[in-house]
Amino acid sequence: MIKLRMPAGGERYIDGKSVYKLYLMIKQHMNGKYDVIKYNWCMRVSDAAYQKRRDKYFFQKLSEKYKLKELALIFISNLVANQDAWIGDISDADALVFYREYIGRLKQIKFKFEEDIRNIYYFSKKVEVSAFKEIFEYNPKVQSSYIFKLLQSNIISFETFILLDSFLNIIDKHDEQTDNLVWNNYSIKLKAYRKILNIDSQKAKNVFIETVKSCKY
């Protein structure tokens, strides 16, 4: 249902400078300033620029411990959560626990998606919307939407939001209706994350329909 688009040769080790380039690419990608897919996971960085970095120690240590695929997942998992995450923070134990939780979430994506859909459905009953579709629609009066608030509150995951977007077009519809700064910051990250995911939108839609049906009975 969902699969990451990763750099080629993921089972190899890379040097410290290459780890820095990978980190920089993903960080700029998540901030909407670069496109790792368009440029095929390539970026030019001079040796001089890398040597000037006071934090190159962290990149070197990571290069000795993790393969390319693992590094990409570590950076993606942490930069999805925080676009401005510093390499020193990403290198600590908490960040690595976060990475392992992210891997677990991806492996159980169907279960997590169904769980989030049920939470959305029960939330819709709690707030007493006149129609279930209102949960996914932008409300100009409050400059937000229920589905966005659920994402902000960590009730649903970024993966669930993007799976829903694959057949409901939530992100683009919100973009058309608002230039709200808070939404814009999330929109940049969501669209960047969406680019590095291969999604089976029909399967996501089928799971959504079946899960909502099961909640009604």
Curated annotation (Swiss-Prot):
Q: What does this protein do?
A: DNA helicase loader protein that participates in viral DNA replication, recombination, and repair. At the fork, required for loading of the replicative helicase onto DNA protected by the ssDNA-binding protein. Coordinates simultaneous synthesis of leading- and lagging-strands.
User: Which InterPro entries does the entry link to?
Assistant: Phage_T4_Gp59, Phage_T4_Gp59_C, Phage_T4_Gp59_C_sf, Phage_T4_Gp59_dom_sf, Phage_T4_Gp59_N
| GO BP annotations listed | bidirectional double-stranded viral DNA replication; DNA replication
- Which source organism does the UniProt entry give? Enterobacteria phage T4
Upper classification of the source organism reads: Viruses, Duplodnaviria, Heunggongvirae, Uroviricota, Caudoviricetes
Q: How does it assemble?
A: Monomer. Homohexamer; when associated with DNA. Interacts (via C-terminus) with the DnaB-like replicative helicase (via C-terminus); this interaction brings about the rapid assembly of the helicase onto ssDNA. Interacts (via C-terminus) with the single-stranded DNA-binding protein; a ternary complex between the helicase assembly protein, the single-stranded DNA-binding protein and ssDNA is an obligatory intermediate in the helicase loading mechanism. Interacts with the viral DNA polymerase. Binds to single and double-stranded DNA.
A GO MF term: DNA binding
Report what the protein is called: DNA helicase assembly protein
Family classification:
Belongs to the Tequatrovirus DNA helicase assembly protein family.
Q: What gene name does this entry carry?
A: 59
- Record's keyword annotation contains Aminoacyl-tRNA synthetase: no
Keywords assigned by UniProt, alphabetized: DNA replication, DNA-binding, Viral DNA replication
